[in-house]
């Protein structure tokens, strides 16, 4: 019915109160002896660390008005996993012109359909990342388009968005 993953997503997300108690908006772990370990825990490849260091610069310069990246770092710092259901359980209406952060018009394919959860739940036998899911998730989120977009400075992206609107 679901799997565990090292990867994170806040689209259609939910959490437990005990996990949220660890939320570290200030990211107090930075410049500590744990920083490299936490960064390494964000992904599986060296390029992932480079990407997440870039996200830190965006946060430091207040280019993003979001909390989700800090949440991702919190999960990494606490070595917590995410749970992904077999099927999307929500219809995400947070895309498009009225959206706060995701103003792109193209809604990702995994939000097109949703299903109700099926009972009884089929639980994974172990609480470890499910590698098959993680490979697919990584490939989907690291397509050529997304990879190129990462290297375009945020100011330019914001300028282009304003022109398009």
Stretch-by-stretch model annotation:
Residues 1-165:
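An acidic/histidine-cluster motif and surrounding catalytic segment
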């Amino acid at each position: 019915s679901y799997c565990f993953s090292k990867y994170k997503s806040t689209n259609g997300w939910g959490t437990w109160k005990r996990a949220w108690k660890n939320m570290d908006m200030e990211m107090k772990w930075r410049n500590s002896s744990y920083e490299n370990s936490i960064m390494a825990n964000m992904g599986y490849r060296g390029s992932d660390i480079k990407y997440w260091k870039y996200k830190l610069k965006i946060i430091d310069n207040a280019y993003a008005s979001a909390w989700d990246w800090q949440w991702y770092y919190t999960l990494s710092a606490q070595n917590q996993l995410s749970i992904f259901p077999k099927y999307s359980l929500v219809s995400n209406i947070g895309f498009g012109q009225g959206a706060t952060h995701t103003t792109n018009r193209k809604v990702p394919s995994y939000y097109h359909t949703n299903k109700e959860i099926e009972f009884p739940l089929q639980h994974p036998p172990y609480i470890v990342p499910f590698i098959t899911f993680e490979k697919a998730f990584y490939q989907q989120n690291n397509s050529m388009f997304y990879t190129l977009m990462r290297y375009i400075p945020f100011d330019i992206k914001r300028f282009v968005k304003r022109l398009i609107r």
